[in-house]
């Protein structure tokens, strides 16, 4: 119900459901959210629910939302780094910047340091993945988002002041 209220509040502010996008990471917590969305009725949410496109040639069961793997996390981290370094994304949230300072390479992927949180970082990375997906259908985002076929520099640490 909270997600429906958030979507409704956004709709009241912009008066157009065509520009409201939402999704969940389809991990354990996201699966619970998907059950609630299904029971509440997706049609009762103002906006468009985004899901990762089904990959051809896989036998896995398709699930709504975005599946986060080490590879997808590395890719979105590279995209995020590019957006920050090219000043296409400005971070204004002090708690987010604080979490980014504790978001480190860990076992072939990225995660928060032991004892730290990364929920804001992972929410932002999900938002970046959603923006990349939306760009495929909205040409006006082409100049604001890096293209998939552009050479992406692998994620490296960067300092923010």
Where are these regions (language model features)?
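Intrinsically disordered, low-complexity regulatory regions of eukaryotic regulatory proteins
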Residues: 23, 116-117
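Helicase-core coupling region on the C-terminal RecA-like lobe
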Residues: 117-120, 139
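Acidic, Mg2+-coordinating catalytic modules of nucleic-acid enzymes
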Residues: 19, 113, 120
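Mg2+-dependent endonuclease catalytic cores in nucleic-acid-processing enzymes, primarily RNase H-like
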Residues: 1-109, 158-161
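Acidic two-metal-ion nuclease catalytic site recognized across multiple nuclease folds
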Residues: 127-161
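Long, compositionally biased intrinsically disordered regions
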Residues: 112-115, 137
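Amphipathic alpha-helical interaction/assembly segments
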Residues: 107-110, 120-130
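Short, glycine-/Ser/Thr-/acidic-enriched flexible segments
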Residues: 28-29, 96, 115, 128-131
């Amino acid at each position: 119900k909270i997600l429906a209220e958030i979507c409704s509040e956004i709709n009241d502010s912009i008066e157009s459901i065509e520009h409201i996008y939402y999704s969940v990471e389809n991990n354990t917590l996201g699966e619970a959210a998907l059950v609630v969305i299904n029971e509440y009725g997706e049609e009762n949410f103002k906006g468009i629910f985004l899901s990762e496109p089904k990959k051809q040639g896989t036998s896995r069961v398709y699930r709504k939302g975005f599946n986060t793997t080490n590879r997808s996390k590395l890719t979105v981290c590279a995209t995020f780094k590019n957006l920050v370094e090219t000043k296409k994304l400005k971070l204004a949230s002090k708690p987010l910047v604080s979490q980014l300072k504790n978001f480190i390479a860990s076992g072939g992927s990225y995660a928060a340091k032991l004892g730290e949180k990364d929920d804001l970082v992972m929410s932002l990375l999900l938002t970046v993945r959603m923006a990349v997906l939306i760009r495929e259908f909205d040409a006006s985002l082409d100049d604001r988002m890096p293209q998939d076929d552009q050479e992406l520099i692998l994620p490296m640490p960067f300092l923010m002041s």
